[in-house]
Amino acid sequence: MTKMRESEIIRMFIEEFDNHALGDDAGFVRFNDSWLLVTSDMLVWRTDVPDFMTPEEAGKKVVTMNVSDIAAMGGLPLAFFFSLGVPENTDEKTLRGIAKGINKGAKEYGVKIVSGDTNEAREIIIDGGAIGRGSRLLLRSNAKPGDLVCVTGELGRPLTALLLWLKGEEIPPKILEKAKNPKAREREGIELSNYANSAIDISDGLSKELWEIARSSNVRIVIDEDKIPVNEEVREIVKDPIKIALASGEEFELVFTIPKENLGNISFDFTIIGRVEEGEGVYIKREDKMERLPILGWEHLKGGDYVNL
């Protein structure tokens, strides 16, 4: 059994590859006067699909996961492809539901399903991929001192839904809807490509994503606890809503850093939660105290758990 975390495995592979530029939400190669973006993201039934989610919702989620990666790079999603691992005892209803969900997601985001593969597996695995195009890329490594740190949407619902489900408690409809049917911010990503310096999607938790930007850009990020956009229902349900908002993964909201003078050009709703400074690390301001922010969020291969939660 491996003793390495998911993030450690990723870093190890990047070290072995000649292309050390890997590490963003999507890979990219120059294609004429634009960038060709390619990403892949996998959904494994045992770890990624709680029983409150239908096969159709799971199929659509795989498309969302991959489109979100393209959006975080500031790209226009164009195509979706996937490989499907299927146990031999899987019923047709489940497979048909997955197929309908993939098609529904492709229609919603305006991407074409261009390729697929199927093989036998011990459990259902959907390994999705997306192709996109961008003119100006949003990289995790391009945050600049003086940038403001912003986030789209409200945070906390997916993790709240998961924790309630694990405890066997009823999940309020609006909390459940975000967990079952997340949305990629593809339009926002395209707009941000003109004005922001860096971006990342919240797939593993706000805390982890902020650390990714800080490390990749060699900067210090300071956020204000009072400015984190926690969903109101989450505040009413959980004991520590800020911690939940910082750790909640599969939000697929965008975190971005942007020069202050460019804020007026943004047409969608967002929340300013902090700033980028010279230095290193991620810090959170709580009342009059400044604390180093722990890395909270989902981590595969350590029991599949939310680390430090």
From Swiss-Prot:
Binding site for ATP: 116-117, 140, 203
Binding site for Mg(2+) 5: 204
UniProt superkingdom: Archaea
Regions crossing the membrane: none
Binding site for Mg(2+) 4: 25, 39, 69
Reaction catalyzed: thiamine phosphate + ATP = thiamine diphosphate + ADP
Residues reported in the UniProt entry to bind Mg(2+) 2: 41, 69
Record keywords, A-Z: ATP-binding, Kinase, Magnesium, Metal-binding, Nucleotide-binding, Thiamine biosynthesis, Transferase
Function: Catalyzes the ATP-dependent phosphorylation of thiamine-monophosphate (TMP) to form thiamine-pyrophosphate (TPP), the active form of vitamin B1.
Note: Reaction mechanism of ThiL seems to utilize a direct, inline transfer of the gamma-phosphate of ATP to TMP rather than a phosphorylated enzyme intermediate.
Protein name: Thiamine-monophosphate kinase
